């Protein structure tokens, strides 16, 4: 039977971003003592980060399992004994990490590969200390590929008119059917880019003749963080060797590199090295390669050197098939009228569709009731989408109302924080809910294309990191979308 902490972790896994859960929740240990949940982190750095940014998420999940009177206490465990830290083995595999029931058959030898004639050496104390002080997100010690747990596969990817080209291209990368070693996937958030990257990684690992296939999967932000860690640890050459010697590189969210020249230089050098040795590379981005700004032309050229595939919003039939497949995985019977309601009302984001379904199932189980249309209406209030899209004028109107600004203030040249945040929210909503291009959005605000792109990227970064500003803006945007769509539908 799943422990209480296991149930809480399961809720968090389905409500937090995968990266947040992977890095910050997985290492935690939890124990319930009466009405107190004691959560132990591996060190004070992690404990402090969890207290500052995830405390309310943990408490909310705990209340759903234990009750509303639960008290959550986050502490740091005692430092581990000074055992030798594992170091690089030849051609290390890299890492993806949501735990599953998959077996863990191998370990990395605790020596670093050295040129012939040299004795193996262990990591310097300075390197170990730098990595430990920087905390979990910057810890880039290798993990054998056999321990990688790919969360998705091609088998559970629902193909529709919106994504069939991207899926076919990803499959082609796995069977040498694409006639190129580079693939660039682009789409808005929550439409399947991560799913396809995981599917490519899983497929290539399963078909490899090697017991330890050399596949690297990480986001551009993780790449940057690990490079910073290597610089601080004075171990850049080992970092370079690690990523320039892989057979497959799966690099997510490359739009993060905009405006970061030094990071772009390292990514470009890595891509050049990999392409010269015939390695396969899959990039993903929230923007098409042509829309990336403040990115070196050579790097953009490398992005465009292979096959470019975009993913659009799923149509009604595809959304309905996604819901049925997820219900099958959850082993629940989903009435047709509930399926149709969810598919009709949530139209822009597959992740929201899955989240809404999960919350519906969780509510039914907690209340020990059957899933019904009435219950679905109660849940969908948090995700409600009208059949028609908001137009640009409606977005401007509701942003002004939501942020307490006049249209003149929203469109002014002022750099006041509240004006900038509101404008960025308007850019994001216009991109999400209209067919306007970034240039057209910029024209309507008398701004440049690059300004709109920068604003959207900055706002998405705040929301993805779940900073106080990011949470506040995400809640405001969600409320605006919900109320704005309801108002729009009534007109």
UniProtKB/Swiss-Prot annotation:
It holds the Pfam family Bac_DnaA_C. One of its GO terms (cellular component) is cytoplasm. ATP binds at residues 190, 192-194. GO terms for molecular function: ATP binding; ATP hydrolysis activity; DNA replication origin binding; lipid binding. Residues 1-68 are annotated as: Domain I, interacts with DnaA modulators. InterPro entries: AAA+_ATPase, Chromosome_initiator_DnaA, Chromosome_initiator_DnaA-like, Chromosome_initiator_DnaA_CS, DnaA_C, DnaA_dom, DnaA_N_dom, DnaA_N_sf. Keywords: ATP-binding, Cytoplasm, DNA replication, DNA-binding, Lipid-binding, Nucleotide-binding. It is found in: Cytoplasm. The keyword Cell wall biogenesis/degradation does not apply. Residues 147-364 are annotated as: Domain III, AAA+ region. Plays an essential role in the initiation and regulation of chromosomal replication. ATP-DnaA binds to the origin of replication (oriC) to initiate formation of the DNA replication initiation complex once per cell cycle. Binds the DnaA box (a 9 base pair repeat at the origin) and separates the double-stranded (ds)DNA. Forms a right-handed helical filament on oriC DNA; dsDNA binds to the exterior of the filament while single-stranded (ss)DNA is stabiized in the filament's interior. HAMAP family: DnaA_bact. Domain I is involved in oligomerization and binding regulators, domain II is flexibile and of varying length in different bacteria, domain III forms the AAA+ region, while domain IV binds dsDNA. Belongs to the DnaA family. This is Chromosomal replication initiator protein DnaA. It comes from Nitratidesulfovibrio vulgaris (strain ATCC 29579 / DSM 644 / CCUG 34227 / NCIMB 8303 / VKM B-1760 / Hildenborough) (Desulfovibrio vulgaris).
């Amino acid at each position: 039977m799943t422990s209480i902490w296991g149930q809480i972790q399961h809720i968090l896994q389905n409500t937090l971003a995968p990266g947040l859960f992977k890095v910050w929740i997985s290492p935690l240990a939890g124990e319930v003592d009466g009405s107190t949940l004691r959560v132990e982190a591996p060190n004070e750095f992690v404990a402090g980060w969890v207290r500052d940014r995830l405390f309310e998420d943990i408490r909310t999940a705990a209340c759903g399992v234990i009750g509303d009177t639960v008290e959550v206490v986050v502490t740091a465990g005692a430092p581990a004994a000074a055992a030798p830290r594992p170091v690089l083995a030849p051609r290390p595999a890299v890492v993806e990490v949501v735990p599953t029931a998959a077996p863990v058959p191998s370990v990395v030898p605790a020596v670093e590969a050295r040129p012939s004639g040299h004795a193996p050496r262990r990591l310097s104390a300075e390197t170990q200390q730098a990595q430990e002080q920087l905390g979990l997100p910057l810890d880039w010690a290798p993990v054998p590929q056999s321990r990688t747990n790919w969360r998705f596969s091609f088998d559970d990817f629902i193909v529709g008119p919106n994504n069939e080209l991207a899926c076919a291209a990803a499959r082609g990368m796995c069977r040498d059917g694409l006639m190129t070693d580079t693939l660039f996937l682009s789409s808005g958030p929550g439409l399947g880019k991560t799913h396809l990257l995981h599917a490519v990684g899983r497929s290539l690992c399963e078909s490899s003749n090697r017991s330890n296939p050399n596949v690297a999967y990480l986001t551009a932000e993780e790449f940057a963080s690990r490079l910073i860690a290597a610089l601080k640890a004075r171990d850049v050459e080992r970092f370079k060797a690690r990523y320039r010697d892989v057979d497959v590189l799966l690099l997510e969210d490359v739009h993060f590199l905009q405006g970061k020249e030094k990071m772009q230089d390292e990514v470009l050098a890595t891509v050049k090295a990999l392409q010269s040795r015939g390695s396969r590379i899959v990039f993903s981005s929230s923007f098409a390669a042509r829309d990336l700004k403040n990115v070196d032309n050579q790097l953009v050229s490398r992005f465009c050197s292979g096959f470019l595939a975009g993913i659009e919003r799923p149509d009604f039939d595809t959304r309905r098939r996604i819901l049925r497949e997820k219900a099958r995985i959850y082993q629940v019977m989903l009435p047709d009228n509930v399926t149709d309601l969810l598919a009709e009302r949530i139209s822009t984001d597959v992740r929201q569709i899955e989240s809404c379904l999960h919350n519906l199932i969780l509510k039914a189980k907690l209340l020990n009731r059957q899933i019904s249309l009435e219950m679905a209406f109660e849940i969908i209030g948090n995700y409600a989408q009208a059949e028609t899209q908001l137009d640009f004028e409606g977005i401007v109107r509701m942003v002004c109302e939501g942020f307490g600004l006049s249209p003149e203030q929203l469109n002014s040249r002022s750099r006041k924080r509240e004006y900038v945040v509101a404008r960025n929210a308007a850019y994001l909503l216009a991109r999400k809910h209209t067919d306007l291009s970034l240039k057209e959005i910029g024209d309507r605000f008398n701004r440049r294309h690059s300004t709109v792109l920068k604003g959207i990227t900055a706002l998405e970064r705040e929301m993805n990191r779940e900073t106080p500003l990011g949470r506040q803006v995400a809640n405001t945007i969600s409320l605006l979308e919900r109320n704005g769509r309801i108002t729009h539908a009534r007109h």
